[in-house]
Amino acid sequence: MFARGWLLGALLLMTLATVSVARPSLKIDLVNTSAPEEPPTKNQNCVPVLFSVHPGELLKLKCPLSGADDVVWTKDSSSLRPDNRTLVARDWLQISDATPKDSGLYSCSATGLRDCDVFSFIVNVTDAISSGDDEDDTERSDDVGADGEQMRLPYWTFPEKMEKKLHAVPAANTVKFRCAAAGNPKPKMRWLKNAKPFRQEDRMGGYKVRLQHWTLIMESVVPSDKGNYTCLVENQYGSIDHTYTLDVVERSPHRPILQAGLPANVTVQVGQDAKFVCKVYSDAQPHIQWLQHYTKNGSCCGPDGLPYVRVLKTAGVNTTDKEIEVLYLPNVTFEDAGEYTCLAGNSIGISYHTAWLTVHPAETNPIETDYPPDYVEIAIYCIGVFLIACMVVIVVVCRMRTSAKKPDFSSQPAVHKLTKQIPLRRQVTVSSDSSSSMSSSTPLVRITTRRSSAHDDPIPEYDLPEDPRWEFSRDKLTLGKPLGEGCFGQVVMAEALGIDKDKPKEAVTVAVKMLKDDATEKDLSDLVSEMEMMKMIGRHKNIINLLGACTQDGPLYVIVEYASKGNLREYLRARRPPGMEYSYDIARVSDEPLTFKDLVSCTYQVARGMEYLASQKCIHRDLAARNVLVTESNVMKIADFGLARDVHNIDYYKKTTNGRLPVKWMAPEALFDRVYTHQSDVWSFGVLMWEIFTLGGSPYPGIPVEELFKLLKEGHRMDKPANCTNELYMMMKDCWHAISSHRPTFKQLVEDLDRILTLATNEEYLDLCAPVEQYSPSFPDTRSSCPSGDDSVFSHDPLADEPCLPKYQHINGGIKT
């Protein structure tokens, strides 16, 4: 009876002890109501102590019975014996890696003591697992139903934390949805997406469910993860559900973007009101200021080169975005005339636009003079005749000048002129030490189209602002043979005299990009934008650098470096030995055998070039061996910025236009969600590595484009090339990780390749007789039914029709656009 009473008391205390962390010793007095109090005698228990620990932790109990000759440990009235987890000492009991089965009533007993000879511990090993990502442990204690609780249907334990139903998060972030619940018996939870069961294969990269915390976790979310997520909690007595809505926001780290043409110049009279408007677009919260420029001692700038400005208006706590975007100047005076700047900044950088305020004197009321009516009418007629005569003379002179300059158009009747201004995608900076040659205002390409009634073909002209740092005289440029052409442009070899400023009298072989005769206004805008992109990126050894441009008095010429050995894919294929599948020109085979170190060097140089582009906030989007050029000294240079975009452009990360896409080089998030990041370039770099170590092999050989989509979703990757080490193949597979955030950065790739290149030796010649195309031989080497380029490189975007994007190839050292 005595032991049974202790067990009932222990069960009652364990029911009350549903806590998540071990607390200091809690003393509970047990009162015997069936008999009066007596002095402590033998076989009388001391006050029990309550302990609570987590699973996996160390349970350590110390028997406080001092002076005992012998101590015996028991659990639930059964003797404890040492084993691989249990250590029983004289006055210590230690259990490692505790589990819920270790919960119970522990006692240590001794003989020969005056006060008491049994001391008890009530141990509760909770089944809640702590996590720094979820709520604290005291909240989790309510998620577990106690054994003594009455049967009931599920209920939410923290409904106040589930009130936020709409969650909008940036792409590539981690999302957690929690539905903490309880019930007796303990309910089960399952998740639905858009009212359908949510399975692991429904999402690229899968998801995690932490049942102990009632939590759904999705890493690196993409736009396809948008939808309604419902947690359904149920037991045999009923069910409850709660729905969260997830919206994945496309965001790109960029400084504020100001709308072109705002603020505009304003002209008012003295006493009138002036108003400037500045439209700011920024993902991160921008800070906006209005500045007024002034002069001091006749100078507009200080000794440090910075302009003198005073802050007129700044964003504050009580200021809305629409209020700060408008500068209102009431009752202006002549002192208010001058330059005003709208300055916007965020954590990424700052941008600004400037406008001028012109103040004219107020109009005075004309003095009324009583002229005879006849004289007023005569004056009006004379002035009208004079103005008409002036207009006729001006028109005749202008037509004569136009005819003298362009005799081809003089014979064409009824010529109509349509003028259009196209803003360039050019970066704006306020840094005093910036190396950019671009001014603060966005330059415009002014395109004039002449259309004659006798000829249907438009004749485009353009007016591009001259950039002194890059302008090159046409007289010093001698065009040579064509190197290639594409959808809208062509590339020719040329000799540029004095383009190397260190050797002003020496001619340098260059490549010149230009438009074809049937190019459109969009083609011109694309070529100018590519030129501006190359200006912004700057110079690096492992990219094709801009050397100059001819923008005045003639067609637009973009002058770039010339690579004599063509593109990397043809360079590798031409050095294959006889007998391999690719047909090659024997006359182009190099006498120098390729070594393993040569291939690692190619990979290392391309990684360095991509590391530099990433540091300049530029994403290539079309990295492949066909877009890497090889110079005479075997230097790898990344080319083809036709698809490249600066991440400061707000519409860059998600491709909204349609056209031809290099699907076999594209990362899954770019292929399926059209999300482009530096990590999607890393995926393409892994495919380029595979091309290098197969000596110009075609990725996924024999796999149709339609089948490729399915294989990528199922996690299939290309096999290890024959000429590749296990370490380099693991590097490729790291680049092909399904979750973009788990891929290495270009900086890490450069460090690893530098180490491998240092350890490689020139004597490691390649076994070039091994087969190159070894992936999935069950598929015949057939082309996709979709229109594609070489080796099924490109696939049409099925969303809409659009002329093909520029695709560059290289023939005999040239660039094919």
Curated annotation (Swiss-Prot):
Q: Which residues form the active site?
A: D622
What exactly does this protein do?
Tyrosine-protein kinase that acts as a cell-surface receptor for fibroblast growth factors and plays an essential role in the regulation of cell proliferation, differentiation, migration and apoptosis, and in the regulation of embryonic development. Required for normal embryonic patterning, limb bud development, lung morphogenesis, osteogenesis and skin development. Plays an essential role in the regulation of osteoblast differentiation, proliferation and apoptosis, and is required for normal skeleton development.
Q: Quick one: signal sequence residues?
A: 1-22
Protein family according to the UniProt entry: Belongs to the protein kinase superfamily. Tyr protein kinase family. Fibroblast growth factor receptor subfamily.
Residue intervals passing through the bilayer:
378-398
**Lineage of source species:** Eukaryota, Metazoa, Chordata, Craniata, Vertebrata
Q: What is this protein called?
A: Fibroblast growth factor receptor 2
Annotated ranges, domain Ig-like C2-type: 26-126, 159-247, 256-358
The record's gene field reads fgfr2
Where in the chain are disulfide-linked cysteines found? C63-C108, C179-C231, C278-C342
Instruction: Look up and give the organism this protein is from.
Output: Danio rerio (Zebrafish)
